[in-house]
A protein has these predicted regions:
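Catalytic PLP-binding core of fold-type I/II PLP enzymes
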Residues: 1-19
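Conserved glycine-rich beta-strand-loop-beta hairpin in the small C-terminal domain of fold type I
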Residues: 82, 86, 102-112, 124-138, ...
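Short amphipathic alpha-helical/adjacent loop interface patches that line ligand
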Residues: 6, 101, 108, 189
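Conserved core segment of the aminotransferase class I/II
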Residues: 27-105, 112-113, 117
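PLP-dependent enzyme catalytic core of the Aspartate aminotransferase-like
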Residues: 30, 143-146, 153-162, 167-200
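Proline-centered loop/turn at the N-terminus of a beta-strand
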Residues: 1-3, 33-35, 161
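Residue-level recognition of strand-loop junctions within catalytic nucleotide-signaling folds
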Residues: 57-58, 90, 136-138, 179-181
Length: 200
């Protein structure tokens, strides 16, 4: 029997116009075989607090998970993390998330359009959620006779701290975080344009 462990941590961060579809809502079978994992940590910047939780409808599966997790106190919530979790999911938290989603959409739209217009040979998909963007730089690297390590170092050298996409099984990918003020997104893309992708 197959059990699905579904990481739903980004479910709060769908961009405006898109909707998160929980794995457990797809079918009765999915509901019974899925362990869905959630946390407010990415959405509300609470990663330092232990506030993850799971939703498991299948009683037998839930009992197994709860027994295994009770053997260690490593992931046990404390008073502060419980109050942070409750506070995050109050109406004020949702209002904040709605505003955050608008900022992330603005950043994602700007980045997507800028890349298509200015970074010839870089491919990407328009994101539907979260704040990460994956740049497929294979064509660009081949056209410029360079490798991904050199490209990554060039960005870091001009203050663009991006992440190697290879650990995510994408050999020429760069992972770019767009969770920052829009003015800094514009500055980062200006630097990438002048000093990395279109350097003279």
């Amino acid at each position: 029997e197959c059990v699905v462990i579904s990481d739903e941590i980004g479910s709060d961060l769908t961009l405006p116009g898109f909707k998160h579809i929980p794995t457990q809502s797809v079918s009765k079978d999915a509901r019974e075989r899925t362990i869905a994992l959630y946390a407010p940590s990415k959405t509300f910047n609470l990663a330092g607090l232990v506030g993850s939780y799971h939703i498991i409808y299948n009683r037998m599966l839930r009992d197994r998970v709860e027994k295994a997790s009770s053997l260690s106190h490593y992931n046990s919530p404390n008073v502060l993390s419980v109050h942070a979790l409750i506070g995050a999911y109050r109406p004020e938290g949702y209002q904040w998330v709605d505003e955050l989603r608008e900022v992330l959409k603005s950043n994602a739209d700007y980045a997507y359009n800028y890349i298509l217009e200015h970074f010839k040979g870089v491919k990407l998909s328009k994101p539907e959620g979260t704040y990460m963007l994956y740049l497929d730089c294979e064509e660009w690297c081949k056209e410029h006779d360079t490798d991904i390590d050199t490209l990554l170092k060039a960005g870091v050298a001009v203050g663009v701290i991006w992440q190697d996409g290879r650990p995510f099984h994408r050999p020429y990918a760069i992972r770019l975080n767009l969770a920052l003020p829009h003015v800094l997104v514009k500055e980062a893309f200006d630097r990438m344009d002048k000093y990395v992708f279109n350097a003279k």
